[in-house]
Amino acid sequence: PWGESSLWRVSGLAKQPGNQFGRTETGKTPIIPADVQAKVFNYCEEVLAAAPEILNERDAGRLGFRNPALIRIRDAALYVLSITSGMRNEEAIGVESGSWRSEARDGVQFHWVATTEHKTGKGKVEFLIPELTVKVLDLMNRYAKPLQEKMALEVAELECNPTPQDLTNRMLRLAKAKRDVRKLFLCTSMSGQSESAGYHVDALSNGGSKVSFRRLAMAAGTDWQLAPHQCRKTYARNIVESRMGRSSLVFLKWQFKHSSMSMTQLYASNPMQDASLFDEVLEEMTNFKVDLIESWLGDQPLSGGA
């Protein structure tokens, strides 16, 4: 009943084909080194600064949806969102148009972006983001609009198609397109299409995000094996180091105005936040202290014994 797919792939339990897309991470998730963070973040800033002009070219019909310059915008925006929010990749690529908001409370400006948390089944959650990430999301709203419109047209065509031929695959595609039509991080895909039919619009997948991050790292001039899952842990470490008086260059660029608030106050500011992110920050606090103490101790036994 799953057409050309399978129960495991439809349910999201199957590994995607190809080692480069599979879940090959083993052991402890590495923290992105500070120099790599700086290189990648600065590169992303350059890409996003040039984005309005590139989008003007696209809107004028002089650039196609698959142009590398447009793909660089999407990749850079995904990295900035991930590293400044602490979202898991599935949550970041699930952000939809109009899902962010700002509010002032007791003289402090808060910016929130909502998405769906799948790992623990909590559902809708909100993440605290800096103002620069709001601007990136506004830019992505413009980036995604024509792709969303193309997907909406496909939805309408699928709904109006009365023929029984290939019905199962059409219904699966219709359900997926309806689910993804408001997402910001979209791509073009030939999956299931003939060359003559061209491409259709799809939501960026976890596998596609991994490829995007590796491409981003290479373009930024680093050989670090950058991966989406590293951003959440790196975000937690950046928060901890900031509060321990060791802010990185990147963190200083998007330092929250409410950084003097305690973690308890930050969590209490919005009950819809992802509590597990705060758990990871506390875990990194412990790791940081252990690393700090170990750095004080040399390799020589303190007793001086053999």
Feature names for model-found ranges:
Residues 3-306:
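Extended accessory and catalytic-adjacent subdomains in large enzymes
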